[in-house]
A protein has these predicted regions:
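C-terminal functional extensions of proteins
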Residues: 2-157
């Protein structure tokens, strides 16, 4: 299985923070400086582990890279952004939309995480009964249109 990743490199991330920190507008400068302090203090960490680019769902991480899985499991919160990461979180399966997010995470469910996603693929889990049906009445292609988004939290329990 192949994945297309359009996200940033570590260099891009740090360069962007530096540019924002030096911006002429104070509110940009405020956030850039604050974000830089989060990185410097170890509150935020950007990871470039090899597993991120493997053609595997995150539910395989404990088996394939147990040390990295243990590191994420020990983190107070791991934030995932993007449709591809969401697909890898829920194993890119055609879940019933009301399947719990935790169940869809499979063996990755012990990780405390927040998933931020614009819906661009027809896989989703953790919706309340009737939600998908109601949205489908208004927008039949809502799961792939990029016009809808989703924020989901997993407590790791």
């Amino acid at each position: 299985m192949y994945w297309y990743v359009s996200d940033v490199t570590q260099h891009d991330f740090h360069s962007t923070i530096n540019i924002i920190s030096r911006h002429s507008l104070d509110h940009y400068k405020f956030f850039g400086t604050r974000w830089r302090s989060f990185i410097d203090q170890g509150i935020w960490e950007v990871s470039s582990e090899t597993f991120w680019c493997l053609g595997l769902p995150y539910s395989d991480m404990a088996r394939v890279d147990p040390a990295f899985f243990a590191e994420l499991k020990a983190s107070p919160l791991v934030i995932f952004k993007g449709d591809l990461n969401y697909r890898k979180l829920v194993q890119d399966r055609n879940w019933k939309t009301t399947t719990s997010f935790s169940e869809a995470l499979g063996d990755f469910s012990p990780v405390v995480l927040l998933a931020l996603r614009t819906c661009k693929a027809d896989t989703i889990a953790g919706l309340e009964p009737g939600t998908a049906e109601n949205i489908s009445k208004q927008s039949p292609d809502w799961m792939v249109s990029g016009e809808y988004g989703l924020i989901q939290f997993n407590s790791g329990q």
